[in-house]
Structure formats: structure tokens, C-alpha cells
Amino acid sequence: MKSSGGTSETTAILLSGGLDSAILLGHLLDQGVRVQPIYIATDCIWQAAEQQAIEQFLAVLGSDATLPLVELAVPLADLYGEHWSMTGSNVPDESTSDEAVLLWGRNPLLLVKAMLWCSMHGISRLALATLQGNPFSDASPRFFRQFAMSLATATCTDVNILRPFAEMSKAEILGLRSDLPLHLTVSCLAPRAGKHCGVCNKCAERAEALRLMPGGDPTIYANELGLVDQIF
């Protein structure tokens, strides 16, 4: 899937290993953009699965316009403590609302180090795969605008936060690049044996979206293999 043609000034992207940011990467490449993927390592329980997904996805994508992955550490164990994102206990299951997966201050934590890195390396654009309907206050236009202004004041440089999917649903973005190796992505709060658990909030969201794709959902879920213990 190598990209051809010229590329423009570099745009960084927060790449999580999930569906949304993978599609955003493909979308940027379609526009002839040279992309700098950035992964924020937070030590949440899904980190190893995300890192593996990103490595495999980028290898298969094989785009000359994608720069080597930058990984920045923002460990959260001291902040989140016994939260389910650290322990894996009482993970929000498929019956819960989007609000149940709140991670306190997630976007500020993900953005601050990535934006500083961009500023230090002369990159003026950072793209996020935030979708329409995100219920959290740190995904609002006001937050992104004010956060970017604060960083600009602190560093005397401008890093613009791009959110090209902000007015789109997951079903709509899936239609943009259904040819991507999306089976390699991971969208799970509690991976089991390298597979999606199949019973968490994010697995339910993933399954609902992918089953509408041609060929259906290719994901192998651990609960279908009897690999999920009773922690939910």
C-alpha cells in the first residue's frame, strides 16, 4: 500500500492503534501529506496491544510518506491509581454508555507532550481522530482552541490541532478507507491473549461499526474462544 506522488509539509498524528486514528492516517496520506505518527505510552492495560497493532499496521501500510513512529511516555499509574484502566478490574462492559469510559483529563495528557515534541521539531500541525458525538468536555472545540492557545503562549510557537473527523460518525469514516488493513487495529479496554476481549464497551462499539462493512467484522474476539475471565 505504498503511497505515490509528492508530499507536503509534515503533519503529526496521534496514533493509538485503533480504528479511528488508523483511518485518519490513511486519509492524510490520500491528501498527499507526509505524516509523523506519535504514540503516547500511558501504561494503561491496553498499551501492549496498541503498540503491537501500530507496528503491524504501519508495516503492512508500507507508506513512504509515513515517518518512523515516535513514542512518548506519559505514565499514569501514579495519577490513576486503582482505576480500571490500570488494574483491569471492573472494566466498563458492553452494556455501559460512552460516559462510562471516561479517563480523567485524557486529551490534555495525550496532547501536552505530543504538542511540545511537535513544537521542538518544527511541526505545526497535529491531527486527532476525534469523532462527532464525543461526550467529554476535553473533546470540545472550546477545549482544543484554548489548549492550543495556552501551549502557544508557553512556547511562542503555534501547533494547530486538526480534527478532520469532528463532524463525522464512525460509520462515515469507515467509508473513507475501507481498503486499509483495519483488522490489524485494536479497540479494546481489556485485551486477552493478544485479542479483543469481546465484552467491553469499546469492543461492542467496534463490532457494531465493522459488521456494516463489506464482509462483516473480521475481528477475533477472546470471549468467543473462551478466553475471558469474569472481571467485568
List each language-model region with its residue ranges:
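Local cysteine-cluster metal-coordination motifs and their immediate loop/turn environment
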Residues: 108, 112, 186-208
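Charge-dense, low-complexity polyampholytic segments
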Residues: 126, 190-195, 215-223
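A polyampholytic, Gly/Pro-enriched intrinsically disordered region
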Residues: 93-95, 180-186, 205-212
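ATP-dependent adenylation/nucleotidyltransferase module used to activate substrates
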Residues: 1-180
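Short Fe-S-cluster ligation motifs
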Residues: 204-210, 215-232
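Short, intrinsically disordered, charge-biased short linear motifs at domain edges
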Residues: 174-177, 182-192
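Serine/threonine-rich low-complexity intrinsically disordered regions
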Residues: 62-64, 75, 200, 217, ...
